[in-house]
């Protein structure tokens, strides 16, 4: 019997306001990432040992979008969303965040994504996403203000 590995990750929802309408950034995961290839996700990554989820969130944003800390603002920190994927042998602990993007035109995706799109949050259900992405978004939106 295989053991299930507890795996903390961050998922960051970057937002921008387009003429009064809120949009969130989603990224299509490349074939080069370790799981859920070609699925849509927020900006996400493993929480490294000795690093807080808050710090990891800023690191993932910088690595995956090129945005620096002064180009985003953390708005909310959601409650952890859990998901067990026996096929991967992982029990995910998803730390969701909501960020305001101060420089959306500066975003450049890295190798982890094949494309990125700004969508209305209501459109999320139209995409094949990583597990629990909608729940993570709801948690982030309803999370504590930072």
Show where each model-derived region lies:
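Nudix hydrolase/Nudix homology domain
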Residues: 37-38, 90, 94-96, 106-146
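A short coil-to-beta-strand element that immediately follows conserved catalytic motifs
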Residues: 68-78
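Short loop segments at secondary-structure junctions
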Residues: 16-20, 30, 100-105, 120-123
